[in-house]
């Protein structure tokens, strides 16, 4: 689910996912619930007032980075070229940064909300 950021639609989706995924019934099959980082939205939360995205789990996406960039470029209305936070360059840079935090060439950060072990 999206991390609760400035985008009102992302906040609504986050709240809906939190309600729909409550582990209150027997046999709940959701083993992992994690929030993802959203380029150009997650970093706009007000510092020290609202929670800012801090990943506590980074997945190695080195083998998938080119596919991720290609998929991202399919959403033309969401791209801010050439140097915006929603550019292919920024997506790649964020993957390099998140990967460097965990020893991968490219990584994608998540914040684990709930995990059943």
Predicted regions and their residues:
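Metal-dependent de-N-acetylase/amidase catalytic core
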Residues: 1-117
């Amino acid at each position: 689910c999206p991390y609760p950021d400035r985008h009102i639609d992302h906040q609504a989706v986050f709240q809906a996912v939190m309600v729909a995924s409550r582990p209150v019934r027997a046999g709940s099959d959701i083993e992992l619930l994690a929030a993802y980082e959203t380029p150009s939205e997650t970093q706009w939360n007000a510092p020290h007032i609202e929670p800012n995205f801090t990943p506590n789990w980074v997945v190695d996406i080195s083998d998938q980075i080119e596919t991720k960039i290609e998929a991202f470029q399919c959403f033309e209305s969401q791209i801010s070229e050439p140097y915006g936070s929603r550019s292919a360059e920024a997506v790649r840079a964020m993957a390099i940064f998140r990967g460097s935090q965990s020893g991968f060439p490219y990584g994608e950060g998540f914040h684990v909300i709930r995990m059943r072990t």
